[in-house]
Regions:
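Iron-sulfur (Fe-S) cluster-binding modules
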Residues: 1-94, 110, 255-265, 271
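Small-residue-enriched alpha-helical segments and adjacent helix-cap loops
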Residues: 64, 91-258
């Protein structure tokens, strides 16, 4: 076999670059907000407690996405309220993270009651197997998210620049194979959750503990992701999760009996 050729520089040619390396570009404003607010805290509690407005600050609005919350306003009332010299009719949407779209009867009943008592009376089922409240007033926001957590559900990472709700076949009781893929779906969802303690400190009321383990995000880092990331798990022959429309897909490989999960084929780059 011929050896690889060795290329030597021309004696009259400089081996150093003519121009210095480009300086690192400054972070986009949204990335700066994430990096400068330790682990998605920011002034959220202060903003929620501010009764002078129905909205929150722009910076907090960038952080609440990671907590599953978006600010909204009633467009139909904009002109009327502007003429009256009032601010927009602000409210909030909260998205509940439901891996595989599975919840218990008790959880559904609790969410249905919250939709009537704290939102606009609707509970929406999204195309990505999550649930959404709309029309939550700021004064009801903490109580709503706290009640969702007391029902053993949460809104963490339902929105924002993180891995979103992980989808799977919507009927895990269809077979033992479907139940096994649902367990994998839940494991993926748990593994990709942000590790910040801010969510439970703010919405559940966990105490700040001094001297504990330093907080870190081993998967995401301090700026989390540049954009959202979506994962699905499919059980052939069904493609009910629309696997090619997502960033990362796992297609179950089964044995000849069709009952035992052997592994997964992996798809990437959808969306």
């Amino acid at each position: 076999a011929k050896p690889f050729p060795t290329f030597l520089p021309n004696p009259g040619m400089s081996t150093t670059p003519d121009t210095p390396p480009a300086a690192a570009k400054p972070l986009h404003k949204n990335e700066t907000i994430k990096s400068e607010r330790p682990f998605l805290r920011g002034p959220l509690l202060r903003d929620i407690a501010d009764h002078s407005t129905g909205a929150i600050t722009e910076d907090s609005g960038q952080l609440t996405k990671f907590h599953g919350i978006y600010g909204q306003d009633d467009r139909d009332l904009r002109n009327q309220r502007r003429k009256e010299g009032k601010e927009k009719a602000f409210s909030f949407m909260a998205r509940i993270r439901v891996p595989g779209g599975v919840c218990t009867t008790a959880q559904w009943v609790a969410l249905d009651a919250l939709a009537d008592s704290h939102a606009n009376g609707t509970l929406k089922l999204t195309t990505r197997q999550a649930f959404q409240f709309h029309g939550i007033l700021k004064g009801d926001l903490w109580r709503t998210i706290n009640a969702v957590n007391r029902a053993l559900l949460d809104t963490l990472a339902a929105c924002g620049d993180v891995n979103r709700n992980v989808m799977c076949n919507p009927n895990p009781e269809q077979s033992a194979l479907h139940a096994e893929t649902m367990r994998v779906t839940k494991a993926i969802a748990d593994h990709r959750l942000p590790r910040t303690r801010a969510y439970r400190e703010i919405w559940v009321g966990d105490d700040l503990v001094a001297g504990g383990e330093p907080e870190s995000e081993p998967i995401y880092g301090k700026t989390y992701l540049p954009r959202k990331f979506k994962i699905v798990v499919a059980v052939p022959p069904s493609n009910d999760v629309d696997i090619y429309a997502h960033d990362l897909g796992f297609i179950a490989i089964v044995d000849d009996s069709g009952k035992k999960l052997l592994g997964f084929n992996v798809t990437v780059g959808g969306g």
